[in-house]
Amino acid sequence: MKRLFLILVLITFPVFVFGQAKKPSLMVVPSDLWCNQNGYMTEENSMGEMVPVPDYRRALINNTDLLPVISRINGLMADRGFPLKNLESEIKAINSNSAETAAITSKDGATVKTSALEQLRQRAKADIIVQLTWTVNQTGPKRSVTYTLQGLDSYTNKEIATSTGTGEPSFTAELPVLLAEAVSSHMDEFCDRLQNHFDDLLQNGREISLNIRVFENSGDVDLETEYDGKELREIIEDWVYENTVEHRFNLADDSEVYMNFDEVRIPLYDDRGRAMAASNFARELEKYLKLSLIHI
């Protein structure tokens, strides 16, 4: 059992710490579309395939508009009571922290690579990612901004809210001001949708995906190994059933070496009232397997 490894898909481990308002924490980032249009993309190896990903660090360094724009959106969100994670600060913390690593290593030396984007989400622990896209329109001496805001659940990457529009033409040359003017009239509705999604999580649990893998060096142990007449995968599925909100989960696929669960609803708080992250849920499963099966 000690060689089983649990992976949380979209490996991000937000910890929920709520004040009385119980509002989700947000992190505003430039959208993939904006990064691609402005040349701030890079490539990372994902299971042997090179995939494009946004290069936020390079964008913040080289684009003088990006930081003021994000700061202005952060201000609008803060005015409505949302706790915020600062993109620039989180990136600096990752780069300066020698403990940060690009890989998760098991006790047996096997590794599961973690992308730079996953590291950022792990570090920031934001409940919702707000992606921002904007373009500047020129009409004679006046300028306006067309924008799109997308709220994404940080675990599932599902879009939960969107807002788009174009501000009134203005003589001002300051991009953050133009953007704020364009966004402000739609911000309350956008924030209401973010809050509605989070309220659903409070009632019905956080949706995550859970993957279980058996390392190649696991010897004779796999998910078909029997303990007291039950296969290991049956034992795992029973535990997931008992520990999800209203037993809501879906075993999408499984074999003797892997199990893929999706639509897994985990509680936001444990039995002691402490905030529960996806990593806590996975560790509880690991503890259960070690304690239950070591004596069988």
Model-based region annotation:
Residues 128-172:
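Amphipathic beta-strand/beta-sheet edge segments enriched in Tyr/Trp
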